[in-house]
């Protein structure tokens, strides 16, 4: 799957078959690799991924919309990278540098937060989740060794709501929230409220 092939499918199949929505894979930059799960380890919220460039992503949305198909994007807000890429400085699929050992992800930088994401922007729990009956552990410890965003942080909420707004402004009309049970409910409410404020015309 690439954004170009999805665009072609919209034109040749989904539109003519009156499909209303198509869900696509996470569109943000991720770690390198061809395996499906690499898309769920973001290193920035740039819309350049192994599926195509930002321009190709936006063109796909335009082509699908033209035949009556709206796009739902899979969104990864719970975590960044895991132990499989925790070996010093590396680069994502779009060339963004990050350090999975120290928790430094400058690619998440915004105008408000030019330093990007650092280790202090993650929950302090560094162990993997093992007890799914413990809500705090489920929502603050690591899923499969991946760094767990401190979603209660205003900084993290701002960066993530900006990302969702960028998707909305690109034409995405729905979100499938990956691993949302691992994020505090109040945090998701705050991110949604921020999104509503900044995505209004």
Q: What is each of the regions a protein language model found here?
A:
Residues 1-11, 16-170, 186, 190-201:
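Substrate-binding/active-site clefts of carbohydrate-active enzymes
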Residues 174-180:
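Short catalytic-loop micro-motif centered on adjacent basic/acidic residues
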Residues 183:
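Active-site environment of divalent metal-dependent phosphoester hydrolases
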